[in-house]
């Protein structure tokens, strides 16, 4: 009886241990699930508040209220309001930059083999690709272009323009190395023309075009920009 009692205690202890471990795992899984759910609610509320009020006018208390949490709980997820804004727009920023860099590499490849015809085709393809990507992240670009005052992203368009200007200067170097005649534009001219280019693309977001309208307009814009670009460069 004594031995059986010991065995029963051991069995009971083992069962309790297993049960405790199971509950610990269950609590852990629940905690992870709750964290992820809360995180998503914060992102959703942040997106809604930023789109409605802009970054500067968005009140963190109202944002937390929309997510159903306290401000204390908010800081378990984000360091500050700026960190939340970054989380909402950074994937879109990085994605557009990656597509820009890939298109730039294709352009330089064509120039290096004197294939100017395909160079202009890349410009058209790139514009359409940009629109496709922008409309798959529409709210993020709306935040970038319309709601970013007070954030480090307020100069996003100028960053794209400056990148385009620098790559155009690199293109000039390659054209000269290849002995291809062209007309060189000044920095202010390049900035103005490239700013007009991106302003036209981003108009589709600022004025809430449908994706179909944006793509149709982009084809017209691509023909217009490409013809003008070739004309002013004498290519």
What are these regions (language model features)?
Residues 104, 108, 113-114, 122, ...:
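Amphipathic alpha-helical segments used for helix-helix packing
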Residues 129-136, 150-177, 188-195:
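Amphipathic alpha-helical packing segments from all-alpha helical-bundle domains
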Residues 6-53, 57-66, 79, 83:
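Basic, helix-initiating cap at the start of DNA-binding domains
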Residues 68-78:
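Short hydrophobic/aromatic patch on the recognition helix
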Residues 117-139, 191, 195, 199, ...:
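Amphipathic alpha-helical segments that line or abut small-molecule/effector binding pockets
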Residues 143, 172-224, 233-234:
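Hydrophobic/aromatic-rich alpha-helical bundle segments in the mid-to-C-terminal region
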Residues 41-48, 52, 62, 66, ...:
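Alpha-helical structural segments
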